């Protein structure tokens, strides 16, 4: 990158110490951009981002955001309500694009980076995307998808890294040279030195800031519209539960910024208090994550169970996390042994967040001070969040200790789906969001998750629909039928397991099937385990009974199961 964004201090050097203060959450009548801009005064010279040793100050970050926003308006005539997609790994470029888009009243659409080309192309069409910010590796997915009038801004993961680190990555990365520049394709660096611009005033209660996908791939594409007010309300409630008070706290985020939990706790909450965020472009590289946490002195971590498992159950990585005092976990419940590794072994504080994309990523929380608590406890509703549990048959509220469907209502909740699956239009009934989760409430007012009714697997923080995977498996010539379920994979959270019935009744096609699925499924959709069977359990009507498969998978040794590493 250009010289103006060179770091002020190298990795391991002293940070300028900001004064401890509570998070500055803007009022409900404000733009999300105000969360960042509040640091332009006293904290302009403090680090906002740390990216593999490079420090970007709040002044530099705000300048980059303002420039990017002004260029979007002047070059592409972006106006309020236009939709711009971000398909990037965690990086400074993601955060710059995020704030620039919402500043001018446009709509940010986060898209997962690990998907196949056909899925990506169709998604851009359905969402009516005006432009997209992506990286050079992702450019190959959409080079043939760009329609007339759609612009593409391309960056590299190594931009914003220190020169030596960036040079090593560039040496092995050939994707930048394959980008066809010109026309409507532009390098990200061209947008860093424009004018400041003015932004557009927003009506926070009505103007959409983010279109959040709740079903991320075809044919199960779902989305909700989250307003500026929804996000700021979620942030306000989050800050009631957790306030960063340390003078030089550094928040490390190892969950994709494309999910609400991650952008809420991973950078909006820290930046609301003027603290730096430690960013990793590869959230699966646990060795590098751990070492950077140690070198920078990060003391707060935002991640999800699968990442925590990789970090904490490996002595080579866990030894680097001794300075982490607070662990925040979201997107799924955490196993008892994983909670014990944090609370008992590392003596850290553990905050578990539970929520839905439809509720801006939050509905419940719990501070885990006893690793012996049931692992499926999701905790208490946030301060401004109302919950009730109803009998699915009568619709009446159930008594304490009885099971029923969880309904959620709060200022962070979306009003309706932008588009959705047939049969789920009524999930927003009146002011209440029907979660599809069966829960119970104990005498203390804490909620316990019993069962998820919706056929969705949360794999590595991303919602996955089993029927999408089954459709691809069943197209393989040697397969007769299949069933895909989510299984508890120890401390890793949910893993994807495929039960396959072949036409010849054997597993001889296993290698070819896995190769076929790797070519036709997005990375996050690929099964972790396979089990080949002669038949699948079915009802009298011939419908596969997945409940039996789930029970069998939970209670058996995996003697007939192939694991894919």
Where are these regions (language model features)?
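Conserved ATP/PPi-binding loop(s) of AMP-dependent carboxylate-activating enzymes
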Residues: 380-384, 396-426, 462-464
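Conserved pre-ATP/AMP-binding loop-to-beta segment of ANL
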Residues: 176-213, 220, 243-250
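AMP-binding/adenylate-forming catalytic domain of the ANL superfamily
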Residues: 155, 521-544, 562-565
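Gly/Ser/Thr-rich phosphate-binding loop
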Residues: 176, 298-303, 312-373, 386
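Conserved AMP-binding/adenylation subdomain of ANL enzymes
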Residues: 232-250, 258-300
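Conserved AMP-binding A3 loop
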Residues: 57-59, 200-201, 209-236
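AMP-binding/adenylate-forming catalytic core of the ANL superfamily
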Residues: 115, 122-123, 132-136, 410, ...
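Conserved AMP-binding/adenylate-forming core of the ANL superfamily
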Residues: 28, 45-79, 85, 89-91, ...
């Amino acid at each position: 990158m250009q010289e103006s964004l060179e770091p002020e201090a190298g990795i391991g050097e002293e940070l300028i110490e900001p004064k401890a203060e509570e998070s500055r959450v803007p009022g409900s009548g404000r733009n999300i951009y105000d969360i960042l801009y509040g640091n332009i005064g006293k904290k302009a010279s403090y680090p906002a981002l740390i990216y593999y040793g490079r420090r970007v100050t709040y002044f530099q970050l705000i300048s980059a955001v303002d420039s990017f926003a002004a260029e979007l308006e002047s070059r592409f005539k972006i106006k309020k309500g236009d939709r711009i997609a971000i398909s990037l790994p965690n990086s400074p470029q993601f955060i710059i694009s995020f704030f620039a888009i919402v500043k001018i009243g446009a709509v940010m659409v986060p898209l997962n980076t690990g998907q196949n080309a056909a899925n990506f192309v169709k998604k851009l069409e359905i969402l009516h995307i005006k432009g997209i910010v992506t990286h050079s590796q992702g450019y190959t997915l959409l080079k043939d998808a760009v329609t007339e009038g759609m612009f593409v801004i391309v960056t590299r993961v190594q931009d914003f890294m220190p020169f030596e680190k960036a040079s090593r990555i560039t040496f092995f990365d050939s994707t930048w040279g394959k980008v066809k520049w010109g026309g409507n394709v532009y390098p990200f660096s061209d947008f860093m030195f424009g004018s400041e611009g003015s932004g557009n005033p927003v009506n926070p209660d009505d103007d959409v800031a983010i279109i959040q996908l709740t079903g991320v791939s075809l044919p199960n594409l779902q989305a909700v519209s989250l307003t500026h007010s929804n996000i700021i309300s979620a942030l306000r409630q989050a800050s009631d539960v957790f306030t960063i008070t340390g003078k030089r706290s550094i928040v490390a985020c190892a969950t994709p910024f494309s999910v609400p939990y991650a952008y809420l706790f991973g950078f909006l909450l820290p930046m609301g208090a003027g603290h730096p965020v430690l960013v990793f472009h590869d959230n699966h590289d646990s060795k590098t994550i751990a070492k950077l946490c140690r070198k920078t002195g990060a003391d707060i971590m935002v991640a999800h169970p699968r990442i925590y498992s990789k970090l904490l159950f490996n002595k080579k990585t866990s030894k680097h996390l001794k300075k982490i005092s607070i662990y925040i976990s979201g997107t799924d419940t955490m196993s008892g042994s994983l909670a014990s590794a944090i609370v008992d072994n590392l003596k850290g504080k553990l905050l578990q967040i539970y929520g839905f994309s439809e509720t801006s990523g939050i509905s419940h929380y719990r501070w885990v001070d006893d690793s012996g608590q049931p692992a499926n406890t999701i905790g208490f509703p946030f301060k401004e969040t109302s919950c009730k549990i109803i009998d699915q048959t009568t619709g009446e509220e159930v008594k304490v200790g009885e099971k029923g469907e969880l309904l959620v209502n709060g200022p962070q909740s979306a009003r309706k789906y932008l588009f959705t699956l047939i049969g789920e239009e009524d999930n927003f009934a009146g002011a209440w969001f029907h979660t599809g989760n069966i829960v119970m409430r104990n005498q203390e007012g804490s909620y316990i998750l019993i069962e998820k009714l919706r056929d969705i697997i949360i794999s590595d923080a991303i919602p996955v629909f089993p029927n999408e995977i089954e459709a691809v498996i069943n197209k393989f010539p040697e397969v007769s039928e299949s069933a895909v379920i989510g299984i508890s994979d120890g401390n890793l959270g949910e893993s994807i397991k495929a039960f396959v019935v072949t036409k010849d009744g054997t597993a001889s096609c296993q290698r070819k099937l896995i190769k076929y699925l790797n070519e036709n499924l997005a990375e996050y959709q690929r099964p972790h385990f396979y089990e080949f069977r002669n038949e699948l359990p079915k009802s009298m009507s011939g419908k596969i009974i997945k409940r039996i498969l789930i029970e069998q998978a939970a209670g058996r040794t995996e003697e007939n199961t192939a694991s894919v590493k």
